Amino acid sequence: MRGSFFSRLPPQLSLLLLLLLLLSWRRVWTQEHIGTDPSKSPVAPVCPEACSCSPGGKANCSALALPAVPAGLSWQVRSLLLDRNRVSTLPPGAFADAGALLYLVLRENRLRSVHARAFWGLGVLQRLDLSSNQLETLSPGTFTPLRALSFLSLAGNRLALLEPSILGPLPLLRVLSLQDNSLSALEAGLLNSLPALDVLRLHGNPWACSCALRPLCTWLRKHPRPTSETETLLCVSPKLQTLNLLTDFPDNAFKQCTQSLAARDLAVVYALGPASFLASLAICLALGSVLTACGARRRRRRTTVRHLIRRQPDPEGPASLEDVGSPTTTAIQA
């Protein structure tokens, strides 16, 4: 019966029906061996102990008083919530087992130390929240592996210095939150390494009205902000003890500031410095040798002249042989 039915159909349609039958049999076999438990479903991620996971790759580990990043993370995890815990340190490769993470929240922990290789392996991470922690410093290259990052929050920490090498080139970063830290200025190359940056949150920092603010003021003029935000961006003048709006400084206000050397210029200085020192030392040694030789030559001339003067006879002649004390006198006396 089945053979007669398939024989009446076109060959293409017969192959399509056979393919559908094979797919249906595979689905029945999967349900029999795996079951309907969502924890065993390939859609649900492998869940760390004490955390709750849901289909779609979300792992919720919030407010569990965890002292460290939980073990048991997998590549199925797309979103990891670790906020409101007691994680104080991020070691190297802390999230290496969750390389498919897109969203990572570490807000309101007790973070004081983040290793420079803590985020290695998170090349597709898009959002990272490190706000409301106790970070005072960050190592160079900490965020360099996060090439796909578009949102980064460092708000509510104790950062006093943020060098360009810490962030590294983040070509897709659009939002950077730095509010409520201890920043007084931003390094010149920091904003240049973030070409896609559109939102920069800065309020709540003790900005100092100095030449170091020139890169930041230039960026703010090129990226107008809402009035409510710009009104809170104030800097303190150390000499006058007054508050000024960051947006009130035109570019000519920094004309008295000396332009700092670029990295390329510094490299040239560092390269030529030892060479120029060695060249100066060689010149000094050469001049010293020449002067020493000239002095020795003058001394030899003076010595020769003195010997010649002593050997010349007296033009008046000796008064007697006794005065001269010649060998002849000595022989006669003998």
From Swiss-Prot:
GO CC field: cytoplasm; cytoskeleton; plasma membrane; voltage-gated potassium channel complex
Q: Which GO terms describe its biological process?
A: potassium ion transmembrane transport
Q: How does it sit in the membrane?
A: Single-pass type I membrane protein
Key words, A-Z: Cell membrane, Cytoplasm, Cytoskeleton, Disulfide bond, Ion channel, Ion transport, Leucine-rich repeat, Membrane, Repeat, Signal, Transmembrane, Transmembrane helix, Transport
Q: What is the residue range of the signal peptide feature? A: 1-30
User: Where is region (Disordered) located?
Assistant: 312-334
| TM spans (from-to) | 266-286
Q: Name one GO molecular function term.
A: potassium channel activator activity
Q: Which InterPro entries match?
A: Cys-rich_flank_reg_C, KCNMA1_auxiliary, Leu-rich_rpt, Leu-rich_rpt_typical-subtyp, LRR_dom_sf
The highest taxon in the source lineage is: Eukaryota
Q: Where in the cell is it found?
A: Cell membrane; Cytoplasm, Cytoskeleton
Q: Per the database record, which ranges form the LRRCT domain? A: 205-259
The LRR repeats lie at: 76-97, 100-121, 124-145, 148-169, 172-194
Q: Which cysteines are joined by disulfide bonds?
A: 47-53, 51-61, 209-235, 211-257
Q: Which residues form the LRRNT domain?
A: 38-75
Parts of the chain on the Extracellular side: 31-265
Q: Which residues lie on this side of the membrane: Cytoplasmic?
A: 287-334
User: Is Secreted one of the keywords UniProt gives this record?
Assistant: no
Domains (record comment) = The transmembrane domain is necessary for interaction with KCNMA1.
Fill in the subunit field for this protein: Interacts with KCNMA1.
User: Which purpose does this protein serve, as stated in its record?
Assistant: Auxiliary protein of the large-conductance, voltage and calcium-activated potassium channel (BK alpha). Required for the conversion of BK alpha channels from a high-voltage to a low-voltage activated channel type in non-excitable cells. These are characterized by negative membrane voltages and constant low levels of calcium.
Protein name per Swiss-Prot or TrEMBL: Leucine-rich repeat-containing protein 26
Q: What is the organism lineage in this UniProt record?
A: Eukaryota, Metazoa, Chordata, Craniata, Vertebrata
The gene coding this protein: Lrrc26
